[in-house]
């Protein structure tokens, strides 16, 4: 079993942001897959919704909304914050549309395994 040493609160906040978006836009299905290795933790979230629109490069910018009607309910900070958290943990946030419909977001965090834990 691998030892995860990334910041649990940060990972949970990113999971909350990404799952909230997936549930908001999904038609019927949201899939979550977690992969933990000695090098990284990867959280993949996929939905069967409409996918990202033409501005996929802007999705992780602050205050970005694909739907202007969301301005009243959402501040457009979730994907931005998630990207910043991933980057500050030596990782990245990958966003893509899925060929058969929907979107997939992968949050990757570097796994800081302590040397003494590796030697055990």
Predicted regions and their residues:
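Conserved polar catalytic motif of the HATPase_c/GHKL fold
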Residues: 16-17, 21
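Acidic ATP/Mg2+-coordinating residue in the GHKL
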Residues: 47
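Short conserved segment of the HATPase_c
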Residues: 52-65
